[in-house]
Design a protein with these regions (language model features):
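Conserved class I S-adenosyl-L-methionine
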Residues: 2-52, 65-69
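Conserved catalytic/acceptor-binding region of the Class I
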Residues: 138, 144, 148-212, 231-236
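A short SAM/SAH-binding and catalytic strip from SAM-dependent methyltransferases
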Residues: 122-135
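Class I SAM-dependent methyltransferase SAM/SAH-binding core
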Residues: 55-113
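Conserved Class I S-adenosyl-L-methionine
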Residues: 6, 30, 37, 63-65, ...
Length: 271
């Protein structure tokens, strides 16, 4: 039996991110096989302008990788609140950042109902998470509300062609996986600037140039199994064998498109 879960299904999101295990599998693939020598989190941090002093909120902080990988760049005196809907993720972020010299605060919260007063933050970050939010308009309204009038919202996401070769690989293995990895057109992707225009006066986007050249069939299979699909043990074994054959047929590697970037939205219309 093959099951494909919706990317914003609350039950799926809750199970998927109850701890860091699935996320770590996906991060490892990108860390080992990305062609851009500047890692994603180092690049992303360069796109974020942090005023001094700064009050910052990150929604969906995951394991805290953005801050762990940029600890040498953190501005002094910044008040950084890291939050996630998953208590397991918050705990992992706390552990990962225990030795980092910065003023971190941690919170479990829902982006659709942010428990801070209007105009609290200079910067709000939502990295690769808005497509998981069931009521995105409500979340964007909340983000615009808690930003200061001159504050900036940074929202990273992927484009519709992100990992397109991997999606095609999955569909060749099983036509029931045709929609594995596909992002609905009304989700939040790099073509979704119009969604931000309802809440912010300006929004610009920067893309991160990168691709994957994967030479480890087992890790690629683990990546595919780490999110949105449920396969029986027998079908998992069949997928692993299929990926290995495909990689061998392509000279021992599979080249995969990456399309990621970040919006910077300014001028909250709810300030």
């Amino acid at each position: 039996m093959t099951t494909v879960h919706g990317i914003s299904d609350p039950n799926y999101v809750s199970r998927q991110y109850r701890d860091a295990s699935n996320l770590n599998v996906r991060l490892r693939l990108h860390q080992e096989f990305s062609t851009n020598p500047q890692g994603w989190h180092r690049w992303l941090f360069e796109q974020i302008q942090l005023p001094r002093p700064c009050r910052l909120l990150e929604l969906g902080c995951g394991t805290g990788s953005l801050w762990a990988e940029n600890q040498d760049r953190l501005p002094q005196g910044a008040e950084i609140t890291l939050s996630d809907l998953s208590a397991g993720m918050v705990t992992q972020a706390q552990e990962n950042l225990r030795s980092v010299r910065a003023e971190f605060r941690f919170a479990g919260l829902d982006a659709q109902s942010i428990p801070f007063q209007q105009g609290t933050f200079d910067v709000v970050i939502a990295s690769h998470m808005l497509y998981h939010v069931p009521d995105r308009e409500k979340a964007l309204g909340e983000i615009a509300r808690v930003l200061k009038p001159d504050g900036v919202f940074y929202a990273s996401t992927v484009g519709l062609d992100h990992l397109k070769e991997l999606k095609e690989l999955a569909a060749r293995f099983d036509e029931d996986l045709l929609f594995w990895g596909q992002m609905p057109a009304d989700s939040f992707h790099l073509g979704s600037g119009v969604q931000l225009s309802r809440f912010f006066a300006q929004a610009s986007v920067q893309r991160y140039p990168d691709s994957l050249v994967v030479t480890d069939a087992a890790l690629l299979t683990a990546y595919m199994l780490s999110g949105r699909i449920d396969l029986s043990a027998e079908r998992q074994e069949a997928l692993a064998a299929f990926v290995a054959r495909e990689m061998q047929a392509h000279g021992g590697q599979i080249v995969i498109t990456k399309d990621s970037g970040v919006f910077a939205a300014r001028g909250s219309l709810h300030a």
